[in-house]
């Protein structure tokens, strides 16, 4: 409440001046080690992770580029006194998590231009800094990041680092400009909610019970194997490719087969293709047997329950459970799941819910 009141005053008072730091990290990535291949959580917590440098802007001062060893980066961040500033980033889940998990720094307040943009654009523009800068500002995002593929900091020439720094400085200036445009349509109470959602990810508290997860994964895989064995002995796994026979399998599992109107014949037909939304939705059916047969039909090796459990196990090896909810992630305005996980729809009473633990002194 005190934090919310402070933000209310800061946003509505001409007399109270907040001090802002706008920040952007540039990090090592390769074809295999990148956010396109991994979750944000796994990427940042991985031993391969490296900060190439970062740019920062204190209030209206020009953006500055900092590069160096991990120790030098840490020292520069420490000198900025970020815990006593309001931090502005684009895609705060990324930059905020780097600050928190790699350098132990939590700002006074998170202000994320990506979250701020969603209710304004209605999810039609895209959330990239490039797309938003082109819509709301006269600035343009560079493409020097493409030249950084597969390069550690030690692989950059001094000239390359200068160019990368100019690119990063430009990103920070664009983010600062974007923030002032977007904040007009983001009331303090919404900024407060955005901050809370970011903190759920950057400053996680919940832990995962590995014993529960391991037992559950073994149980799910065992049930799937036995189910597929029964199918092999009865109709044969190849029969899953037969629409009528697969429809009977679904009916025996208590699921009414989805239907569609065939474009070719204009007659009703089973909707069992990879492009049929209602059919693909069965991959998330609460009955893991339904998940298994649908996954087998689609040629998917792992069911959703297996994938979720394996994901939880991976997180449990790396630390606490960060929960990323995308503010205004759906067109209705509700939050959506982020970082390839949605803890809003875990099955009630399931093992995944039971695996989430609250540490001592947090209840």
Predicted regions and their residues:
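Compositionally biased regions
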Residues: 6, 14, 64-65, 70, ...
């Amino acid at each position: 409440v005190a934090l919310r009141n402070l933000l209310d005053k800061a946003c509505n008072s001409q007399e109270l001046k907040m001090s802002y730091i706008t920040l952007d990290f540039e990090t090592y990535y390769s074809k295999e080690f990148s956010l396109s291949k991994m979750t944000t959580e796994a990427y940042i917590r991985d031993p391969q992770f490296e900060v190439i440098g970062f740019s920062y802007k204190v209030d209206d001062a020009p953006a500055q580029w900092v590069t160096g060893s991990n120790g030098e980066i840490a020292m520069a961040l420490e000198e900025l006194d970020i815990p006593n500033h309001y931090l502005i980033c684009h895609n705060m889940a990324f930059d905020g998590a780097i600050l928190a998990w790699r350098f132990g720094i939590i700002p006074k307040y998170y202000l994320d231009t990506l979250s701020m943009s969603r209710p304004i654009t209605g999810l039609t523009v895209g959330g990239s800094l490039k797309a938003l800068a082109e819509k709301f500002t006269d600035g343009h995002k560079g493409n020097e990041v493409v030249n950084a593929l597969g390069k550690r900091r030690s692989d950059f020439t001094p000239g390359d680092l200068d160019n990368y720094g100019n690119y990063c400085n430009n990103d920070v200036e664009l983010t600062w400009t974007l923030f002032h445009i977007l904040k007009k349509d983001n009331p303090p109470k919404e900024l407060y909610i955005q901050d809370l959602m970011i903190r759920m990810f950057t400053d996680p508290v919940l832990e995962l019970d590995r014993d529960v997860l391991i037992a559950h994964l073994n149980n799910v895989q065992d049930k799937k194997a036995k189910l597929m064995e029964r199918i092999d002995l009865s109709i044969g796994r190849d029969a899953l490719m037969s629409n009528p026979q697969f429809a009977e399998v679904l009916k025996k599992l208590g699921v009414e087969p989805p239907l569609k109107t065939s474009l070719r014949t204009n007659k009703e037909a089973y909707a069992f293709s990879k492009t049929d939304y209602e059919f693909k939705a069965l991959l998330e059916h609460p009955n893991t047997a339904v998940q298994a047969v649908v996954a087998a039909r689609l040629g998917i090796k792992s069911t959703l329950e297996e994938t979720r459990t394996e994901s939880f196990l991976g997180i449990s090896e790396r630390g606490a459970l960060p929960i990323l909810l995308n503010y205004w992630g759906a067109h209705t305005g509700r939050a959506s799941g982020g970082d390839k996980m949605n803890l809003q729809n875990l099955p009630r009473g399931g093992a995944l819910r039971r695996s989430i633990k609250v540490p001592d002194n947090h209840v």
